[in-house]
Each structure stands twice: as C-alpha cells, then as structure tokens.
Amino acid sequence: MAKMRVRLPMLILLLGVVFLLAASIGIAYGEKDFTKNPPKEREEEEHEPRQQPRPRQQEEQEREHRREEKHDGEPSRGRSQSEESQEEEHERRREHHREREQEQQPRPQRRQEEEEEEEEWQPRRQRPQSRREEREEREQEQGSSSGSQRGSGDERRQHRERRVHREEREQEQDSRSDSRRQRNPYHFSSNRFQTYYRNRNGQIRVLERFNQRTNRLENLQNYRIIEFQSKPNTLILPKHSDADFILVVLNGRATITIVNPDKRQVYNLEQGDALRLPAGTTSYILNPDDNQNLRVAKLAIPINNPGKLYDFYPSTTKDQQSYFSGFSKNTLEATFNTRYEEIERVLLGDDELQENEKQRRGQEQSHQDEGVIVRVSKKQIQELRKHAQSSSGEGKPSESGPFNLRSNKPIYSNKFGNFYEITPDINPQFQDLNISLTFTEINEGALLLPHYNSKAIFIVVVDEGEGNYELVGIRDQQRQQDEQEEEYEQGEEEVRRYSDKLSKGDVFIIPAGHPLSINASSNLRLLGFGINANENQRNFLAGSEDNVIKQLDREVKELTFPGSIEDVERLIKNQQQSYFANAQPQQQQQREKEGRRGRRGPISSILNALY
C-alpha cells in the first residue's frame, strides 16, 4: 500500500511531462504551418481574384507584416526586448518604403489640378487606424492603377455635377437677393432692357413688359419702351410694324423718311424733337452726323397682340428675311410680271446669285451682309437729306410733322428746374392715343416737390444725370397684391415708400394718385410718356403755388393735423419756392453761417481755432 502511494505521484508526474511534451510538439507544428500559410490568408486567396504580380520589395514588406500579425495573434508568451526592438525597426522601414512609393507613384497633371480644385468639397483622406485597413488601402491603390483613367473620369464628372449644383444654388441665392433688393415694382434699371438686334453699326433694345414682375401695372401691358442707337453715317433699313410709335430724339441728329402710298415725307430731327409714327407706316432713319451717335427712345403701342409687336422688312439681310420670301413662286411671278429667277436675284438675295453679282461688281461686302443697320456714304446722305423739313417752331404742333418738347415755354420753372409738357389737347397727333409728353430738367442739388397726377400713369425715361426718387403707395393695396413683401416703415402702417437711385437709361413708373418727389444729385433730364392723359391734373403737396394742402379750409386743417392751426399755417407758408426747391436747405443755411463767420477776419479765425 505504501508502494502504491509512492508510485501514484510519480505516475501523475510522468503523465504531466508527456502531456507537456505533446503540447510543445503540437504548438511547434502549428507555428510552422501558420508561418507557411496562415488560414485567414488562405481564405482570402481562395475568395479573392488573382491580382497582378507585385514588386519584390512589396512582397517582403507584406511577409514582414504577416510575421508581425502572427506574433500579435499568439497566446501571451511574453516578448523579449530584442523582438520588440526588431518590430519597431520593421515598422520604421515599412513607413519609409511607403513614403517612397507614394512619391514615385505617377499621377496625371489633370488629376492633381482636380484634387486641388476639389479641396473645398472633398474631405481629406484619413490615416488608417489599423494594419489591416492600411494593407487594404495599399492594395486598392495598386489595383486602381489600371483604372485610373476611368476613376479620374468619374471624379471629373462628379466634380462637374457638384459644380453645376453649386452654381445653381448660387444663382438661386442671387435671385433671392435680387428679389429682396428689387422690392420696387415701379423701377426698371437700364440692364432690364433686352437686346432685340445688334451689329457693329448700332443696336435696338426693348424693355421687359411692365406687368411681367407685378400685376399692379396691368394697365400698361400694351405699352413697350424701345431704345434705338446708331453710329455716325448709318441708316436703319426700311420697315413697317404692327404698332403705333411715339419717338423722341434723346441725343444726336436724325433724318427720318416716312413713306405713304401717295407721297414721301422727310424730316430733320434734333435733340428733343418728337414725332408720331402710325402703325403700318414704312420708314427709315438716318444718322447724318459725322461724330455723334444717335439715340432715340420710342413708346410702342401694339395693334394685334397686347405687348407684342413685329417688324416687317422688304429687304433680305443676314439677320432677317424679306416679307416677299413668304409668298409662293407663282404669286411673285404674277406680282412682278417676270421670271422667278430674276426676282430672286434682285429682291430675295439668293446666296449664289448674290456672290456672282458681287464678283461682277467687284464689291467686297454688300449692304445685305451688314444687317439691319448699314453704313452710308456722304453722297447718299446728301441725297437723303435734300428735301428734308425741320421740326415746327414755337406754337401749336402740326398734325403730322415733328415738334420739339422745349419749343414752348415750360409750365413750371424757377432757378432749380424746368418742366415742359405737350398734352393731347395741344397736339392733335396724340388725341386718339390719349398720351402726353413731358420733359423735366432738375438742376443738381434741387428737388421736384411732392405731387401726384389725378388720372395719368407716367412712364419716365432717364435721359441724362443721376438722382433718386420717392414714391408713396398704400399698404392695403400692396398687401392684397404681394403679401410676401415687408413694410419699409414699421411705425407707419398706412403707407409704403418706394425709393430707388436713378441713372441714365433707367425707367420708372408713376401710377395715378401716388405722391412722388425727385431729388437730383447731378443735372437730371427726364422724358415722360403720360398714359390716359386727357383731363389729367397735377396736384402739388407743397410750395407757394398750386398747393392743394394750402387750399384746405382753416377749420379743416385744424381737424386734420395734430399741430395747432398757427403751426400748420406757418409750416405750409415756410416754403417760398414752387414746383422746384433746394433739396438741402438746412445744409445750405449752415454753410452760409460758416461763410459769414469766415469773413470776420484772420484774428477771429485764429482765436476760434485756439479756443
């Protein structure tokens, strides 16, 4: 029994030794197999497609990398200091090789420029957080070398799409900001004109429809403003339109020829001359000046369609076709009693026939090649102006000829400005159109006093100068028609002020009944077309003459205004000027006081400076 007790511990010890030996042999065999081909890597090789051969240097790096992963995956056996130092050394080598590969990797110049351009919208690539992510990223970079062109194309396409979206967002923001700035539906800046025609000799521009932005101007939907400009010694070719015109010469000189079935009328026009051109009348305008450009403003009243007008030219140029080309061959042959080939050569301008004719005449360029506005010679100008008449002088305008807006005395005038007006009862040309013409001159630093028109709606064109204007409207009307707009004055809930700066080429509207004042920061010239002008009355709200507030009964003034009747009377009579006044009287008085102080002499000036 005692022997059994001794042998039992020895047997257990032997079994333990055998178990340890077996475990050691198994671990060693597993390490050897794992080093040759790790299971995880075998699975990846079975599932992943065969890749292109990799550089030897990279294979060595990956072999070192797998060896380090093996040590990381083993049971905690404890590492020696030498193994840790070797691992750090391998890590430094891998980092060095990785940097060298990135430096040597070729990248197209276009790709670099796109990456620099895409910095705003593409996030920076982050450093991998683990060795596996680092290895996968390196393999993706190597695998993407074959499809770099495709990838760069996708990136360019994505970049273009994002850039387009960004531009659309910017345009939307700009339009919103423009809509916020453009709270005044009665003001049209000069850039609201659309170019109808342009060549090297001149241009024709048309202002957008007045009711395009707001329904407050529906009564003006059948009126359009057109601006015509031409260089010296040029002619706009003959045409007729399905609209009545009132044209005014703003700058330069012109000779206009009006052709009727039984006669031809020729007029010389100067600055300020106006003329009605009936619908369907064939006409052509010449700029005979050698140095000065011609600038004409026209009010168009279309006949067929509200707000739409069409020009019809008998000639064919590179910009438009002749209305003869709309007829059939048989109709043209019967109309001109000749063969169609002759009609095509002479009137319609067949390209091949024109080229032959040009070579026969030895001309480098015909008038048809220039377009609607063509250059003319000195001899042609003399012939066109031979029988021209001038505009009527002072007195009542003629029934058909031109007249000058400033030929008669101004109806309002003082040292600060002048106001001229031609009403339908004075000018028979405008009676059936129910339109008046005004021309206003406001000197620099002057103010056209607040006033309103009883019936007429005025379309005003800024001919020259700069300034600003203020127009008063009613809040209820504005809220019904545009509820999204905010009030300018939170404290004044009954009225709204529309104000804008004025510059050359701008157009603004003065609705009937809306009080208005205009301030000139430089000499300001304004051309006005009054719509529904019959029996219109202009009522001033300040000044010594034509002041409707001044005409109120004394008792009514006391009931109307919060101040005492004495203060109201004194305030109304305080403005000694009529129609036009100084825009900054208080500042002028201050300057006059300072000027009187300056005349005290040098002693007083020195004392004032010291004390």
Swiss-Prot record:
SUPFAM superfamilies: RmlC-like cupins. SMART domains: Cupin_1. Residues 1-30 form the signal peptide. It holds the Pfam family Cupin_1. Residues 186-344, 403-569 form the Cupin type-1 domain. Seed storage protein. Accumulates during seed development and is hydrolyzed after germination to provide a carbon and nitrogen source for the developing seedling. This is Conglutin beta 1. It comes from Lupinus angustifolius.
